[in-house]
Amino acid sequence: GDVYGFYSGKENGYVSAGVFYKDGKAIKDVAADGFKNVFCVQKDGSVQICSFDEFQSIKDNTMQALGGWDRLIANGKAVEYSINDNNMSFHPRTFMGVDEDCRKVLLFVIDGRQPGYSNGMRMEDMIYVCQGAGCHNAMNLDGGGSTTMVYRVEQGNKATFEIMNKPSDNPARSVANGLLVVEKK
């Protein structure tokens, strides 16, 4: 989910670096430097990826929100990013986008750091994937060993959760929060 899960030393363990809303309530409404992008679901069901500053004008209408790292695409255009080792190197990546109509969410999980299986992606590669998938806005979430996709499997009266990808950390890394996709019945 959110970028990094800084260990707070408190009994609850990890703390989200970015904004985090659940069911219309702010769990965390401030963002650390560098974590200034937000994915949110509005009361009308529309979805957005916006800057922290833009989020301030819509937060009262927000049901769910999750902070993010770098913006990859803003209003249909690739965003320029800084040239540094993290952005130019191949790493496991987790990123997401929304379509122009603000109705469709696209989620991407890319394994990496596993020679012979997957090297990962660079920032530029993520932008190309988002453009090809039709993302109008997109942002980078936490990657590296935090890149994990879990699927709920129902078997009779029981449900189990299975890891669908091959995380580079083994076992899966503890994180502060995540993005849960739920079908309302």
Positions of predicted regions on the chain:
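Gly/Ser/Thr/Pro-rich low-complexity, intrinsically disordered segments
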Residues: G1-K185
